[in-house]
Amino acid sequence: YKRQLIRQFNDRYLLDVTKNKKSPIKNIIMNQKYIVGVGNIYASEALFMSGIHPFRLGKDITKRDCIKLVRAIKSVLKKSIKLGGSSINDHTMVSGKMGYFQNKLYVYGREGSKCVKRSCQSPIIRIVIAQRSSFYCSECQR
């Protein structure tokens, strides 16, 4: 069942979901109706990894963008699960232990810090989309 879900979440599916949408891509990928499990932190991280600006409209997302974004979302979710999630504020695992994914974040919560990409070093910017903080690099994400 798990493999079936993973296979069904692919670039064709994401392209179909985003086409003709006038909403920002970040809102689309956080909408649990379309993609389950992508919250605010994971959306910011996946968009950074795929080089997509969070305000970019769904209708402007290309097939190539979808390939990169699907790969990034899967990578972020797998890494987060492996590290026990993100213990920002009060989240803990069932065991009561804190997760460690927040120690590996590229952009989320790093406003003003330099981009992690050596070739860039631009400051990370914080914006608000649908009452949620979003973090991105203005040079790496278009």
Where are these regions (language model features)?
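Basic, nucleic-acid-binding surfaces and adjacent catalytic neighborhoods in DNA/RNA-processing proteins
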Residues: 13-142
